[in-house]
Amino acid sequence: MSGHSGHDVKYGRHRTRRSFARISEVLELPNLIEIQTASYQWFLDEGLREMFRDISPIEDFAGNLSLEFIDYDLGEPKYSVEESKNRDANYAAPLRVKLRLINKETGEVKDQEVFMGDFPLMTEMGTFIINGAERVIVSQLVRSPGVYFNGKLDKNGKKGFGSTVIPNRGAWLEYETDAKDVVHVRIDRTRKLPVTVLLRALGFGSDQEIIDLIGDNDYLRNTLEKDNTDNAEKALLEIYERLRPGEPPTVDNARSLLVSRFFDPKRYDLASVGRYKINKKLHLKNRLFNQTLAETLVDPETGEIIASKGDILDRRNLDQIIPNLENGVGFRTLRPTDGVMEDSVLVQSIKIYAPNDEEKEINIIGNAYIEENVKHITPSDIISSISYFFNLLHGVGDTDDIDHLGNRRLRSVGELLQNQFRIGLSRMERVVRERMSIQDMTTITPQQLINIRPVVASIKEFFGSSQLSQFMDQTNPLGELTHKRRLSALGPGGLTRERAGYEVRDVHYSHYGRMCPIETPEGPNIGLINSLSSFAKVNKFGFIETPYRRVDPETNRVTDKIDYLTADEEDNYVVAQANSKLDEQGTFTEEEVMARFRSENLAVEKERIDYMDVSPKQVVSVATACIPFLENDDSNRALMGANMQRQAVPLMHPEAPFVGTGMEHVSAKDSGAAVTAKHDGIVEHVEAREIWVRRVSLVDGKEVTGGIDKYTLRKFVRSNQGTCYNQRPNVAEGDRVVKGEILGNGPSMDSGELALGRNVLVAFMTWDGYNYEDAIIMSERLVKDDVYTSIHIEEFESEARDTKLGPEEMTRDIPNVGEDALRDLDERGIIRVGAEVKDNDLLVGKVTPKGVTELTAEERLLHAIFGEKAREVRDTSLRVPHGGGGIVLDVKIFTREAGDELPPGVNQLVRVYIVQKRKIHEGDKMAGRHGNKGVISRILPEEDMPFMPDGTPVDIMLNPLGVPSRMNIGQVLELHLGMAARALGIHVATPVFDGANEEDVWSTVEEAGMARDAKTILYDGRSGEAFDNRISVGVMYMIKLAHMVDDKLHARSTGPYSLVTQQPLGGKAQFGGQRFGEMEVWALEAYGAAYTLQEILTIKSDDVVGRVKTYEAIVKGESVPEPGVPESFKVLIKELQSLGMDVKMLSADEEEIEMRDMDDDDFTNQNDAFNIVQPENAAAEKTE
């Protein structure tokens, strides 16, 4: 290594960065959108099959016909991804299912293939295309099914317990203690019963049986006293009365009700994850840990003693007897009588001494390891969960923390789709059953039985309107990637914003390496929407796992063997940090190592370490890992930094940061915005729109050339957010490429790296107060050289429909429009590509037939002379809205004749794309990567900017007061290191938690020949004098955010009014006015500005007659007339009259003012020079 700290690392083909990382990466980052693609693949391979298996066979009520699902296959999609986007269609493939109908009376079998609707496919990028728009299905964090125990204090401060058995779907079972030490059960949220009633109903009728089963104790005695039933049948009737109040109870009904509630797999489903969690929780291994045996354990087969009475079961003893436990030690077969189920129940029961009372023996009952494929609850589950509850009262067992990630799981795309599909199938099943009983059994075919409507509808509903199916954030590649890795606790079956408390939202120790503690939205969703950590994976049960390096217990060496652990597995181990020092062999060099165990950070002897972190950045998400010097920023500001990077607008000339973290390449590659090579090969041909790669493969050590892969690049397409999506080649002809390499840069990418902004020269200084309150002062050079210029594409559409009075027509023959306005329209009335348009220009000329009114003689004469045209149409052309001017980029025309699919009633659809080049502007919002955001307040000429001793003017001035109180010092370190990197002509990588430290920064500054304090003298550009103090000047990476002033600027003279109050609407989207509210009125009253106040409350707002006359007067240049009565005052009077009050208006000389009646409204509105009256909800339609 040369004289500097750090070493060179290559990122992709074109970029080398000097990395300051000290920890070598043991594990490559996984594919970052695997959470989407793997889950959907599971659904196609297994999820669908599982569902058809669950529902099959469907039998009719008599049991004569049975319909079975044999197999399914997905055909080829109707349109390609690109075509689906252009045609506003779904990217979907037809699902065909093979059905078999068996007539049991005749033994006849009919096989048939049935089409079951088009099924949306996932693109390679992990998105779906629904109605032409890219959407993402966000994974949902929900409480895992299983059994949970929690401690609670009642109002007298007495400690009690509660417990819940939560299924995936089905009835809940809850246990709780009350103030009198009685244990109650609630079945499906009904009123509570003593828990012994449930045990009797399961077939343990007498008090003695229950005491023998659970073990004698005070709680049980109290509960038996409270219980008024004394046998199984009475207990069953008691439960039936609770569940079905008001129906006459019979024992048989009660039995079948309980069976259907709990033991019927169709009505009660734990899912495999629920069965796994229940078996794990009720397993005797964890419950016997550190307890003292109260009986001698004997192997039932050999008769040998495994453990004797009085033994303490520590980890070693326990590990020895676990195999015996699972082979039947302590198994008891219970024979219930008269209960719900006739079958005998197998449980496992072992006696120990209670830890809080050495004399007392207690029974620990397990569920005897039920098979994984039993998805419903069983009597032995119920008995062992009741046993666990009683054990808790004696101090055996643990309560659960529901915010622990071992108890929360992810439902990803595949499972969400499966649940939705299941709803559709079960609706279909009902229809099939009905049809089976109605139709002729001899002639019926599967096709006639099946109605695919409910299935298609449920899928459509899920993709179109579910809370978890979201319009993809495509502002830039990072936003796209983060959206696919988002985890939401909201949505159907999840939490709601209002109900979620602080605990759920808080950072939990089990989030380590699984969910990012930093990246979450500010506002009402904070902590409910999270991001997956960079190395995390999701296992088959939906729990998030994170990788750790295993420590060999014999040698205490850290190996390169990687284990993925879920949160509850990790709870058993001590984990060392990634930056613990190791020698060459992988042994810890220090005797005491900083490590984590559950929620504690401890210094531990090195022999006790079980695992070690894989990488320092495994804690944080991808967006957070893109912030250099994250370790020097306050967490609140880091949160803003991570969130604002996702809002960066793609620039015309993007530039990768001088100071990066090494994540830029990976995140760009996996985001789906770049073009990546599908196979190894040699680039044969490169042009702006296409790259050809000749495949090369190794066969028996020889290179063999194969076919050509053609990659199309997307040029100047509109993204979901209206930014410009443009791909540029990143390779040259003759280059050798490997699979997965970036061939073409997407938006916001530079040489295969994420490039959200630009490196600019920043000085921390004030300048005439223009950067007060985080405002930013900028040099005009950034405007002139298009440094922060971005391209925006907006889409406008116009459709010609059939109306009652005849079809609308697209034409350039528009009433009352001069030839000048039509100069850029072609003969069909559609704008030409390349035309420059301004606000209110015509894009598509369109006329709509008007209702025919009776004509006067004069009008008839005019018609006779000038022909029909003048009469029956009005102008409904598409015009450029305010702030939408630009250059016409593209025009797409869809017509019925050309065979395009259009909505019913639409004959022709025209889409016009207008592109704008937006330079940076005062009022635009900019930010760094450390949460340092601000609005541009002034753009100064270059010659007025402060300049450095060599004459270079700075680009941006930031307020130094923005740093100390916000505690984001990372920006200052980035500033100095960036300056040094630019001077040395290198790019650097400083990974999070393992990047450049202070010495590294200063040594790089020195190497670059800068001053020791990295500050410089600046001269005032206006006077040429030096400023008093030395100033920190350096290179910072600044991004332009999607909050641009062009989208917010808005002005109105006249426009639409609300229907009832006749006041202007609000908001830019409705072309509304500025509200002059109650407080503003007080301000004018305080000034005594009577006339100003009068016109604001009348002619500028809702004095209908007055505003028309005022408008006329201004146009004609006359004086403004007297204001009339505001409409809202009339509304008030009408409201009072509706209460039965007689209210009159009097003028100053006590004459009654006649209120203009509602019939006159039409008259004024027709004469209104700017007609537009809108109901208030019309606003919503316009914003669509």
Swiss-Prot record:
Database matches in SUPFAM superfamilies: beta and beta-prime subunits of DNA dependent RNA-polymerase
InterPro entries: DNA-dir_RNA_pol_bsu_ext_1_sf, DNA-dir_RNA_pol_bsu_external_1, DNA-dir_RNA_pol_su2, DNA-dir_RNAP_su2_dom, DNA-dir_RNAP_su2_hyb_sf, RNA_pol_bsu_bac, RNA_pol_bsu_CS, RNA_pol_bsu_protrusion
One of the GO biological process terms: response to antibiotic
Keyword vocabulary terms for this entry: Antibiotic resistance, DNA-directed RNA polymerase, Nucleotidyltransferase, Transcription, Transferase
Catalytic reaction equation(s): RNA(n) + a ribonucleoside 5'-triphosphate = RNA(n+1) + diphosphate
Enzyme class: transferase
Effect of D473N: Rifampicin resistant
Effect of H483L: Rifampicin resistant
Tree of life domain: Bacteria
Effect of H483Y: Rifampicin resistant
Record-linked Pfam families: RNA_pol_Rpb2_1, RNA_pol_Rpb2_2, RNA_pol_Rpb2_3, RNA_pol_Rpb2_45, RNA_pol_Rpb2_6, RNA_pol_Rpb2_7
Family indicated by similarity: Belongs to the RNA polymerase beta chain family.
UniProt function note: DNA-dependent RNA polymerase catalyzes the transcription of DNA into RNA using the four ribonucleoside triphosphates as substrates.
Protein name: DNA-directed RNA polymerase subunit beta
Source organism: Listeria monocytogenes serovar 1/2a (strain ATCC BAA-679 / EGD-e)
Primary gene name: rpoB
